[in-house]
């Protein structure tokens, strides 16, 4: 079917890199082609004894920035992982035919009987999978030579190797969320010894949004730098919405399965059952969901202290399970059946994101008995999941004052055995409505510096409504800044070089290079053009400073002073 902007199921998908080109780096262990974008610079810049006429950047946009790839959003993007042959060799068919409602004819896969299929399983056996080599190449950004020679600002000036990736996964300090039924995925890694990652939340609700809008938002989030996307749909057509998102997503997709389970019982939390939830897990596993948020750590003993809070339980999944426990007078069935949950996860290599059902919803509730009590249970569940070779990350707060953030990271490392931490912010104040994306990025920078592996974005609509396309862009870019700032502080050579090239371009008045090296080139270019017009300047003089005018530019005068004797 031809693409049509009039067709509500065909949102505009094609995205191109801004003044950059798509490049691919070949694997040496596996037949991989790892996509990156390369920015062409207007002049050579020197750093660490090397000359740079271009700069390769980490690219989360998949085929959407590759003009050589053609695709139909109703059929999905190319299944790149199928070409590596590893999954087909190591797994069996999970069904005779494609599931009902599938957009493709691909038969879902599962682990072979009595054998493992997870990245942790292979890592413990000493096997480097295609996904491990892929993420090592991505993390290096084709800057291995410069990394080895780099000293200033870098703490760990050593290129990432596939073996290092394998060892981190084997130890549980990093995960590659990559369901064997998501062949469109371009693998990425989440761990504190790697680039800090960003997650974007999307999803319809009973109040608004269509399938097409959510697919477009997921692609849009990838365009601006989201490393993973969570589909938090709670409205109609949850299964179909998820299928469209998965088949068109080059990044890992996460879900909160309890949302769909709740929809199946008409929104009545106390009517939920383990059997219904189990079937929902399997349904989503066969579709290809890469990680599940599961609120298995909230127990009945945590409810009394939670009820004393200023803002109670603010996690949707947490409030659902709290109501179920109280209404039925029983322990959380997600906790009671966690071993069975892990058996499902290990069958398809789905990572578990252990949900923080008791995250604080206000700074008054931060670091309280309920929050840290649940965190200890999440540590117990982590070791249980590792017994099944299931990859684990831990979800964290939430609303936490700036001076109390480091304690969260320290306790998470202690209680949860160094499993990756994934936080919503933290938001450092409660009064930033309309600007909570900035609020979140402040706390996010600090906790990422202390070791948090992935930041969940917050948009300007946080606490106010569902984000639209512009909100998604704003939220992703602001949190990309936070993650990048933490990467610099942690000693990332690639992050340091990116900033150094920008500073050289700024000093040289190389405006196009400044735009292209920024995280939002379109906005930077637009604001500069508006400033030129406001100053009545044509732009013919490249040294004209739109900040200071012709007579007060410090960089211009600094360069002039250099010529004086």
Swiss-Prot record:
The answer to whether the entry has keyword Zinc is yes
Cofactor(s), names only, from the UniProt record: [4Fe-4S] cluster
Q: Which residues bind [4Fe-4S] cluster?
A: 545, 548, 553
Q: Give the top-level enzyme category.
A: lyase
Gene3D superfamilies on file: 6.10.250.620, Radical SAM ThiC family, central domain
What's one GO-annotated cellular component?
Answer: cytosol
Query: What EC number(s) does this enzyme carry?
Result: 4.1.99.17
Q: In which pathway does it act?
A: Cofactor biosynthesis; thiamine diphosphate biosynthesis
Binding-site list for substrate: 201, 230, 259, 295, 315-317, 356-359, 395, 422
According to the record, how does the cofactor bind? Binds 1 [4Fe-4S] cluster per subunit. The cluster is coordinated with 3 cysteines and an exchangeable S-adenosyl-L-methionine.
Q: Extract the InterPro entries matched here.
A: ThiC (IPR037509), ThiC-associated_dom (IPR025747), ThiC/Bza_core_dom (IPR038521), ThiC/BzaA/B (IPR002817)
Between which residues do disulfide bridges form?
none
As its record notes, the protein acts as a catalyst of: 5-amino-1-(5-phospho-beta-D-ribosyl)imidazole + S-adenosyl-L-methionine = 4-amino-2-methyl-5-(phosphooxymethyl)pyrimidine + CO + 5'-deoxyadenosine + formate + L-methionine + 3 H(+)
BP terms from Gene Ontology: thiamine biosynthetic process; thiamine diphosphate biosynthetic process
The entry lists its GO molecular-function terms as:
4 iron, 4 sulfur cluster binding; carbon-carbon lyase activity; zinc ion binding
Name of one Pfam family that matches: ThiC_Rad_SAM
Statement: the UniProt record of this protein carries the keyword 4Fe-4S: yes
Q: Which domain of life is it from?
A: Bacteria
Positions bound to Zn(2+): 399, 463
Keywords tagged on the record: 4Fe-4S, Iron, Iron-sulfur, Lyase, Metal-binding, S-adenosyl-L-methionine, Thiamine biosynthesis, Zinc
Which PANTHER family does the record associate with it? PHOSPHOMETHYLPYRIMIDINE SYNTHASE, CHLOROPLASTIC, THIAMINE BIOSYNTHESIS PROTEIN THIC
Q: Which family does it belong to?
A: Belongs to the ThiC family.
Q: Which HAMAP family match?
A: ThiC
Q: What does this protein do?
A: Catalyzes the synthesis of the hydroxymethylpyrimidine phosphate (HMP-P) moiety of thiamine from aminoimidazole ribotide (AIR) in a radical S-adenosyl-L-methionine (SAM)-dependent reaction.
Q: What is the name of the protein in this document?
A: Phosphomethylpyrimidine synthase
**UniProt source species:** Chlorobium luteolum (strain DSM 273 / BCRC 81028 / 2530)
């Amino acid at each position: 079917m031809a693409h049509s902007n009039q067709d509500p199921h065909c949102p505009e998908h094609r995205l191109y890199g801004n003044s950059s080109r798509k490049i691919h780096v070949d694997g040496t262990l596996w037949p991989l082609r790892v996509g990156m974008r390369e920015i062409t610079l207007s002049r050579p810049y020197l750093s660490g004894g090397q000359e740079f006429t271009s700069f390769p950047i980490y690219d989360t946009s998949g085929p959407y920035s590759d003009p050589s790839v053609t695709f139909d959003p109703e059929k999905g993007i190319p299944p790149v992982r199928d070409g590596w042959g590893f999954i087909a060799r190591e797994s069996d068919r999970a069904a005779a035919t494609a599931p009902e409602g599938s957009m493709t004819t691909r038969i879902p896969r599962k682990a072979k009987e009595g054998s493992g299929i997870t990245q942790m399983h292979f890592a413990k056996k000493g096997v480097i999978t295609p996904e491990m080599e892929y993420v090592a190449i991505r993390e290096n950004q084709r800057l291995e030579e410069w990394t080895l020679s780099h000293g200033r600002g870098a703490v760990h000036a050593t290129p990432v190797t596939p073996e290092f990736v394998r060892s981190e996964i084997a130890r549980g300090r990093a995960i590659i969320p990559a369901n064997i039924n998501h062949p469109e995925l371009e693998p990425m890694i989440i761990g504190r010894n790697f680039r800090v990652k960003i997650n974007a939340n999307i999803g319809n609700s009973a109040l608004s949004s269509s399938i097409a809008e959510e697919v477009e938002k997921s692609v849009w989030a990838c365009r601006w730098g989201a490393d993973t996307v969570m589909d938090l749909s709670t409205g109609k057509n949850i299964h179909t919405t998820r299928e469209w998102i998965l088949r068109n997503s080059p990044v890992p997709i996460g879900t909160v399965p309890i949302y769909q389970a709740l929809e199946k019982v008409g929104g009545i939390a106390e009517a939920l059952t383990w059997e219904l939830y189990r079937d929902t897990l399997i349904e989503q596993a066969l579709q290809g969901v890469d990680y599940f948020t599961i609120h298995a750590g909230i127990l009945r003993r945590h409810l009394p202290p939670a009820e004393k809070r200023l803002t109670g339980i603010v996690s949707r999944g947490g409030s659902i399970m709290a109501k179920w426990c109280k209404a039925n007078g029983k322990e959380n069935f997600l906790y009671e059946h966690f071993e069975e949950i892990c058996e499902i996860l290990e069958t398809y290599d789905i990572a578990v994101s252990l949900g923080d059902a008791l995250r604080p919803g206000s700074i008054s509730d931060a670091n309280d008995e309920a929050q840290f009590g649940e965190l200890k249970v999440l540590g117990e569940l982590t070791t249980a999941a590792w017994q099944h070779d299931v990859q684990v990350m831990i979800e964290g707060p939430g609303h936490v004052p700036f001076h109390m953030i480091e304690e969260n990271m320290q306790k998470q490392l202690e209680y949860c055995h160094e499993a990756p931490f994934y936080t919503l912010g933290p938001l450092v104040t409660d009064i930033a409505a309309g600007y909570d994306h900035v609020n979140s990025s402040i706390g996010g920078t600090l906790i990422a510096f202390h070791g948090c592996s992935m930041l969940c974005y917050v948009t300007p609509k946080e606490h106010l409504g569902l984000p639209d396309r512009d909100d998604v862009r704003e939220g992703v870019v602001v949190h990309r800044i936070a993650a990048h700032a933490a990467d610099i502080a942690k000693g990332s050579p690639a992050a340091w070089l990116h900033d150094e090239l920008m500073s050289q371009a700024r000093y040289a008045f190389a405006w196009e290079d400044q735009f292209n090296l920024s995280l939002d080139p379109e906005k930077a270019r637009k604001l500069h053009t508006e400033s030129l017009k406001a100053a009545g300047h044509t732009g013919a003089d490249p040294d004209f400073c739109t900040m200071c005018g012709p007579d007060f530019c410090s960089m211009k005068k600094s360069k002039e002073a250099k010529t004086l004797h």
